[in-house]
């Protein structure tokens, strides 16, 4: 187990015969059974591996629009011991029900809330799960249809870093959330019921870091191979941080580079030219730019390792052309067949 579960509970929000949303509240937490542990471990791993998450914080009503403080207030009371876990999650369920009632598209679902510890941080995981129909074969070889929670396709989930929230009230990234496939609008109600306001632009921070790295190596006296080693070092460090759900720390990254003989990156990156936070989450999609060049347009898709630029792949910006030396065997075979045809 990579997590230590403190408490977990499930409440149901569903439509009644008149189409009105109703809450069915569980009166006690889930037992820490093997099934519960397996479910939460799977959700933790699935959520941690989700790319492109957004980050935010509890908004202040008035300063951050109409942010509802009720969820944060209830969470504060739970953390201080003034409100029980069951009572707090019941309040949260009612808040979600009220928010869902504003929209026509929602059918409700199962609200899962769990407090657990991973590494050195305490978390509150919040997810609205849906049921999925499946078929099974009974002992007498007859088919039977049943419903199960769809854990592999979570689209409405958030995780609050309770440790960061209570240690740094000015942080704007202690809440992470999944961006829905159809865009922010579908998930708005889920953020609104928690009073969450989007804070740090993670993609922008990661892209700025990539630009800083490129400018750093371009202005250095490093050889071509050493420059690529620097990019690889940054990629490896950031990827490792992403894998464990930890933030990129600018000073820590600079120390990693200094150990490899590439000094002064911290002073370079924090000089004011680049608006980089001292710490921010990693974005895997942005990090790939350190290892690969890729692009799509006009019916053409290209992708190649950065180390090939200037060797197997020659770019001429004046003629706007790419020359590829040593065409991949499977592509060459397709091209030869087409020419012969």
UniProtKB/Swiss-Prot annotation:
Keywords: Cytoplasm. GO terms for cellular component: bacterial nucleoid; cytoplasm. It is found in: Cytoplasm, Nucleoid. The keyword Cytoplasm applies. It comes from the Bacteria. Belongs to the YejK family. HAMAP family: NdpA. This is Nucleoid-associated protein Sden_2335.
